[in-house]
Amino acid sequence: MPKTLTEKLNAIKATGKGIFVPYIMAGDHEKGLDGLGETIHFLEDLGVSAIEVGIPFSDPVADGPVIEEAGLRSLAHGTSTQALVETLKTIETEIPLVIMTYFNPLFQYGVENFVKDLADTAVKGLIIPDLPHEHANFVEPFLADTDIALIPLVSLTTGIERQKELIEGAEGFVYAVAINGVTGKSGNYRADLDKHLAQLHQVADIPVLTGFGVSSQADLERFNAVSDGVIVGSKIVKALHQGEPIQDFIRQAVAYQK
């Protein structure tokens, strides 16, 4: 039986709408983790498809400056993995949450304990950008009997045979990385990006979402046209931190009809 995240995103895809997943950094709020539920409900009310929730880490190798700074602010507010898990247990939402974490915080907490402690929360997906596919066995056995999907990341340089290997048996969605580099770098896309995304569609039987560097209306239109939806991080994180209006951008993303 498919996991909840797979079912919910496939249902959105079936309507012809683009899938929209904003990223937020847990604890990057004037109230620290006490403000996480407020942010999740704000995004839920705008109709987003799912929400990616980052766990702060002191050495975020895949993060650009906006998200790296958000992580430092969160850590300064006292955010810990344990505190985040306890906070997630108190948040009621119909929107699937996807945890984005580097492996170190997960290892320190204990993978088995982490998965068990999230069992009764809205968390339905897990992204670990620094965990090689060959080491997925450190995590996958603990997810097998749960409703949490391990999300594969596929870079632009990944050949088709490797794509098949990464995607085989995956649930939730495929995270297609739009740029070679860190998050937040917009506009410098490879000429063969559309071809790469079309190839991913041929081998994936779950939605393909494009992320890293997606920040403008033009990006929304481009990537919704060649993938099943988009993930937006730095633009959302910056707007929430600075109190800038972001509602119209999110509404446009949510309403996108393919």
From Swiss-Prot:
Family to which this protein belongs: Belongs to the TrpA family.
Enzyme class of the recorded protein, top EC level: lyase
InterPro entries assigned to the protein according to its UniProt record, in alphabetical order: Aldolase_TIM (IPR013785), RibuloseP-bd_barrel (IPR011060), Trp_synthase_alpha_AS (IPR018204), Trp_synthase_suA (IPR002028)
Subunit text: Tetramer of two alpha and two beta chains.
Biological classification of the source: Bacteria, Bacillati, Bacillota, Bacilli, Lactobacillales
Pathway assignment: Amino-acid biosynthesis; L-tryptophan biosynthesis; L-tryptophan from chorismate: step 5/5
Organism (species): Streptococcus pneumoniae (strain ATCC BAA-255 / R6)
UniProt-recorded name of the protein: Tryptophan synthase alpha chain
UniProt record, GO biological process: L-tryptophan biosynthetic process
Gene3D superfamilies (alphabetical): Aldolase class I
